[in-house]
Amino acid sequence: MLKKQDLIGIIVKQMSKVICDMQSNVDVEEAVVKKEYFSQVASLPVRENYSLELVKTIYTKTQYPSNRGGFEKDFMMYVDADCEVERFVKINERRHNFVNFQYINENGLIRHYFPDFMVKTADEVYIVETKACRDLNNYDVNAKKKGALNYVNRINKLKADDRMNSVWHYCIVDDRTFYEKQELSASVKDILIYCELTNNNTSDEFFNY
């Protein structure tokens, strides 16, 4: 017999799934698109010792994590130097609170996920999460991925001028793949396409509610 606490947990998980499924199945053709822009946030606080002056982002300086932030720093520098990249932004979840997706965490609760970057090329937008290779099979990483992919699929059903006349993508760039491809002088777009193909599977084994 299930304990009361276990039963409540099951109900919460099922309700969370129903709510997320309902939102994912909204008819996009009838959607009212509210556009918000990164430029609405005029500036971001940064720590001087852990920030970069970059060309292709709207902010004078962009911060990277002080603790184990080397991968993000290297990724930003590589993106900034790539001729196919028109612009990109490092998402700050406190200031860019309009860039988030819902997902169901391991406890069955609905949470908001803020990805790391948005990268714009001529006719594509990439929502990018940078992640250590060892974390790719983490439950929450895969739950966030599922939520982001649902969002991207809905975005791509909108009229072209409501999605920046671009096809939208979501991909997780892991550190091992990034450094391997960087060593081969791969373009940022090639890296993103490769990671989208290899890291975007969402196995149902993670989501047995």
Locate each region found by the language model:
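Electrostatic, structured charged patches in enzyme active sites and in nucleic-acid/phosphate-binding
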Residues: 1-209
